[in-house]
């Protein structure tokens, strides 16, 4: 794929030499791969993004005025966290949590400014990197689950659930959704050769996601894929393209159904699937279950303007919040509790407004927005605060908003 025409709208990209552009794009590909390896601290993703920041700043990274609201909200969120953690910084885990939160905010701004220029090419490199990383993480989880790596079962699984290169099977499952959506788009839209390769990658990711036995990830993939397909049909430029998307999607659903039937014929997989698919899990029910804690925590949040500080919720309740919006109130008081959902839902509103903007990167935009929206919903039932891929998507969303400004202005002038 040639990217020469995609960088012309941005001054710094247009002025950069081919070698610089190639280096910048390669770093974004590497960031996508590194996002899938987070079972060690600091993770490769932190290292790659730090190197990328140095390279991009040295080669002309620009901060745009459109990012001012993003900067302000990220600052206020982390200011709230820091204020509420002031008396807890002697605890190493709290200090590490605060440092990670500030760094995640930095990566959002970094990704936003990077993808605001040379947008189509950089998004494509991130897409490719994420797919490679997802395949690696999935293969690791599959190998661990089926004891294919000597001594790797304990490292690559947790509670007989695949976790691959992640610490938690739930996070593995959540991470795989965006790369799976990218692969799905390729299967239904690209030429046969590329479509087949994407189908193989998708099958590997689907198996990895299944073996993670994450209910949220299963439901998330189904809902986000359905939402993305609807958007692809609505934004298609021809009837033939719409027909291909619909037919191929139906074939893909049939294939996944057959694969699921085959896998569930294995007793170990079937038993775990039935257990995880149940909606009457003990930790979800009761006064101090997942949803009971949400109600009690919300009552506490109204009475505590300065919260209780990061990682303190388990001192009051049997488990953590499992709700990122509640956790913002608990960890950062009213400042973070108000600013965090404000940032998330402002991004969602802007995301809907950009669905039908005709830009060269519309296809990846639909996948990223669908996956982001799914994670926003998942944040009501699980803590997503430090998921690298969540902040990666947030940064890409704002980068695409900024890059789309010339196109939205052009569309507005045509209407007038």
Task: For each feature predicted by the language model, list its residue ranges.
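Hydrophobic core of alpha-helical transmembrane segments in multi-pass integral membrane proteins
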Residues: 33-35, 49-59, 75-83, 107, ...
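A membrane-periplasm/extracellular boundary helix in multi-pass inner-membrane enzymes
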Residues: 229-280, 295-302
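Long extracytoplasmic/lumenal interhelical loops at the membrane interface
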Residues: 151, 156, 278-335, 351-356
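Membrane-embedded alpha-helical segments of multi-pass membrane proteins
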Residues: 41-59, 98-110, 171-180, 219-226, ...
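Alpha-helical transmembrane segments of multi-pass inner-membrane proteins
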Residues: 3, 25, 29-32, 124-158, ...
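Transmembrane alpha-helices of multi-pass inner-membrane enzymes
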Residues: 50-56, 225, 368-376, 384-416
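Transmembrane signal-anchor hairpin modules in multi-pass inner-membrane enzymes, especially those
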Residues: 1-96, 114-128, 186-196, 357-362, ...
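Membrane-interface catalytic loops of GT-C/OST-like multi-pass glycosylation enzymes that act
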Residues: 92, 96, 166-169, 213-217, ...
């Amino acid at each position: 794929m040639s990217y020469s025409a995609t960088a012309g709208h941005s001054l710094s990209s247009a002025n950069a030499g081919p070698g610089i552009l190639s280096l910048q794009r390669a770093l974004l590909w590497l960031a996508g791969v590194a996002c899938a390896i987070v079972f060690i601290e600091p993770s490769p993703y932190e290292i790659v993004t730090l190197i990328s920041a140095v390279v991009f700043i040295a080669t002309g990274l620009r901060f745009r005025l459109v990012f001012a609201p993003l900067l302000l909200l990220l600052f206020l969120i982390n200011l709230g966290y820091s204020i509420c953690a002031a008396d807890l910084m002697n605890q190493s885990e709290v200090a590490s949590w605060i440092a990670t939160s500030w760094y995640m905010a930095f990566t959002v701004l970094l990704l936003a400014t990077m993808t605001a220029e040379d947008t189509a090419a950089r998004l494509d490199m991130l897409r490719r990197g994420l797919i490679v990383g997802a395949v690696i993480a999935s293969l690791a989880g599959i190998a661990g689950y089926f004891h294919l790596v000597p001594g790797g079962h304990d490292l690559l699984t947790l509670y007989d659930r695949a976790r691959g290169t992640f610490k938690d099977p739930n996070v593995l499952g959540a991470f795989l959704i965006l790369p799976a959506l990218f692969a799905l788009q390729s299967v239904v839209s690209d030429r046969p050769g590329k479509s087949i390769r994407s189908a193989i990658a998708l099958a590997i990711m689907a198996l990895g996601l299944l073996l993670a036995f994450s209910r949220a990830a299963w439901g998330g993939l189904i809902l986000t894929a359905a939402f993305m397909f609807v958007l692809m049909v609505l934004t298609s430029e021809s009837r033939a393209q719409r027909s291909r998307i619909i037919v191929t999607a139906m074939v893909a659903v049939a294939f996944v159904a057959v694969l699921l039937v085959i896998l569930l014929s294995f007793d170990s997989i079937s038993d775990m699937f039935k257990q995880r698919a149940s909606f009457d899990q003990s930790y979800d029910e009761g006064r101090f279950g997942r949803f009971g804690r949400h109600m009690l925590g919300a009552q506490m949040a109204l009475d505590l303007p300065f919260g209780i500080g990061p990682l303190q919720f388990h001192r009051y309740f049997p488990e953590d919040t499992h709700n990122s919006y509640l956790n913002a109130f608990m960890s950062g008081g009213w400042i973070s509790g108000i600013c965090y959902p404000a940032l998330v839902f402002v991004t969602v509103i802007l995301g809907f407004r950009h669905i039908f903007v005709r830009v060269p990167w519309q296809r990846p935009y639909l996948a990223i927005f669908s996956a982001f929206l799914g994670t926003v919903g998942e944040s009501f039932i699980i803590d997503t605060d430090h998921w690298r891929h969540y902040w990666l998507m947030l940064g890409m969303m704002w980068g695409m908003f900024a890059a789309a400004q010339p196109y939205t202005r052009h569309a507005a002038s045509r209407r007038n």
